[in-house]
Amino acid sequence: QTLAYRKEIYEKEKKSVSKTDCNNYCNRELKKDYEWLKEIDKFALTNAIYNMDVAYQKFFKEHAGYPKFKSKHDNYKSYTTNFTNGNIAVDFETGKIKLPKLKAVKARLHREYSGQIKSATVSQVSSGKYYVSILVETEHKELAHTNHNIGIDLGIKDLCITSDGKAYENLKIIKKYEKQLVKLQRQLSHKGKRSKNYYKTKKKIALCHEKIRNIRKDYLHKVSHEIISENQVIVSENLQIKN
């Protein structure tokens, strides 16, 4: 709605609308027309408007694509809320998270953190799972200085090979899930659209994609952390790598 408002004002008056104007429009006008907006955390609305403003500025300054209208049918949905007066809390003993406008909910907590909470981003992925990412402000610890330098060559058989001969192989377990993915996609093509079995198979595909993504993400993080921790200078190829 605020994107449509911004576009309408520009087309009619050739006038730029600031993120503050959009936020005021949401509070003064939209909340009158859409009562359910009053039930939503105010920081979530403000952050959504500010994110829209960033996309709008990139469109003009960096020639990025024009901001798109979001749909409730999108596979990925998220919102960000800010910390104030203890409105965000994580209890590791009970395994619960407290968020603004919500009661404490049970969650699988991966690891404890140190530092002051700044914000929380709640997201729902295509598999239907919900995730909460907590942003905290903490003291920066510099890595120990080392005299070792390294070069990295991206491979085909291996993920990459370093100049000292160490090879980081591509994960074989991913092939297992990729085979499952092909099988599920083949099954989906034989299901009647909008049938129960169609949506069940579609969810299995989403879960398989998620599994592959998480395994790959975790592995890349471990590899990059190892390389960064052990070397002072890192040199790599400047290639356009797809996928």
For each feature predicted by the language model, list its residue ranges.
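Nucleic-acid substrate recognition interfaces
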Residues: 1-243
